[in-house]
Amino acid sequence: DGLSIKGNVEKVYDGWRFPKEWITTGFGLEAPKVRYINGYYYLMCAEGGTLGPPTAHMAVLARSKSINGPWENSPYNPVVHTSDNDEKWWNKGHGSLIDTPDGNWYIVYHAYEKGYLNLGRQTLIEPLEWTNDGWLRLKKGVACDKPIKKPITSQGQVGMLQHLSEFRVGKEWRFYREFSSDRYSVDANTITIQGKGDSPHNSSPLLFVGGCHAYELEVEIEFEGDATAGLVLWYNNKYMVGAGISPTARYSYRRESTSRRGSHKETSRIWLRLKNDHHIVSGTYSLDGKTWLKDDWGMEISGFNNNTLGGFMSMLPGIFTCGN
């Protein structure tokens, strides 16, 4: 059933031993993936640890005529690896071998972007080439921090965020951990969400992957009942920042704390903006959708990343509603 082990566990591969002087999190052999190519089983694994020092992670390759080994390590290992802290992409590793219909080979792997660790692990693709002795290695003359030719011509441009205002829950948008279809409804680019909890921290906010260094979110909010709504940049329910607004008051949020920032004439409709300018977060609000006002708060969020907080999360923008 794919859920249990039958027979005795047998060790068949020891991994590739990288030089002792490399700075890693540990040996950490993981993520085996096998492809059968031209009479060989090619085994790609990750080593070095996903988080921690920029040079920690890597992807290594071995091959064997039999799935049971013995396994021969590639003389070109590691296939991908961050060798210097000055590189744009850190912790490169955990790769998969991919071939295209026209017979070309690529490696797809994840890495952190230097200076933007709070975006989480991002997906990269690089072309591979076959050596004369039958190994796959990175294609010479190609750098992962420069544009490369696409493997296959796109049939149409599909922007990651082009459908964002349609509130397609389960696609671009996802509730944090707890999902209930009874809690929301969508009609004509407007989403109605039932408030949950008494603060954004326990509200199970609705989030999406921003994937950008800098951006601004704007939302028009219409209240019913005693509710608070707003915009957040969310790592988890302990570590987040954001701005909230009720019919009469305004709030800012940092980690687990809530600060009241001001009050305004009671209204059932209000506009809110949250700006992330390369880790510097600020917010503004409007009572008419035209004149924008600013409260005295701002935050810096570069430290909200896995190396600091753990959990392999990232800062996700989104919206929340709490209260009744």
Language-model-detected regions and their locations in the chain:
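Carbohydrate-active catalytic/glycan-binding domains of CAZyme proteins
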Residues: 1-324
